[in-house]
Amino acid sequence: MFLIGTALSLLFNSCSKDPVIPENETDNKLHEDPSKMTIRLVECHLHADWNEIQKVGGPHQNPESPAKHMKRIQEITYELKAGKGWRLAEGSQSKFYVQKNGDYYTYGKYTPAPVYLMFIYYYNAKGDLMNSQFIENGQDNIHQHFFTPENVKPTFDGQPEADDNEPQKLVDYLYVDTTPWDKTKHSKEAEITGDSNPIGLKGVIRFLKDRKEFDLKIRLYHGYKSKGNPETGTFDPFYKPSGILIQRGTWDINLNIPVVVFWSREETVG
């Protein structure tokens, strides 16, 4: 009996040291899956150099315009429908109408205008805001939004160009996420941390070509262990997640948002 007991003890001790099979991250996320997503664009001008925004802030909202397609605040909302996937919410506008920025300098500072603050809000099935779930409990270390223009074509009065399919020639984007995530630097209650920890719940975007239509592919990356690129030791650019990053994670969100860049700011300044 002693030998049998010893054998069983060794058997169970051996089993307890077997390699632990990692959980499937797609089935065991530490956050809910969103059921609604709202993207808000706020047209702004700058009180700081574009290249300093991630340190000091600077975008200020422009006053409202009576023009139909020149709303200073625009929102697009998608909802997850059973059996249908993501669908445009009832009553939501379907496209963003924006302007190509003009290149301006103020007291030696590069202050292109307009630029657009872009906020993303996620809601769970109960309708509760759930942005914090992508931040808390270390989730900020494995989540990052990517923004990639696709399906580019000229508007009715535009012309195709050779570099239309180069994302960085169409848009420029800066991560301006804050810590805490739901406070602002302007209120002196938060610091901008988007450069050192890009998430993309808050950002500022500008459009570099006029008379273009495209889909802005918005993807929320969920890394299995990290969102950093192990080959470069840095974060991938906003428009291009690397192949190795894609292999080491999944997408929490993958949606196309239609954008129309109907004219240039310089055409409206006389």
Model-assigned labels for residue ranges:
Residues 2-10:
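Bacterial N-terminal signal peptides
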Residues 9-39:
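Bacterial Sec-dependent N-terminal signal peptides
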Residues 19-28, 45-47, 124-134:
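Short amphipathic, basic-aromatic surface patches that mediate peripheral association
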Residues 38-80:
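Post-signal-peptide N-terminal segment of Sec-exported extracytoplasmic proteins
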Residues 57-66, 231-270:
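Short beta-strand elements
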Residues 68-109:
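N-terminal edge beta-strand
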Residues 102-116, 134, 181-217, 222-232, ...:
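Exposed beta-sheet edge/beta-hairpin loop segments within beta-rich domains
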Residues 128-186:
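Extended, polar beta-sheet/loop recognition surfaces of beta-rich domains
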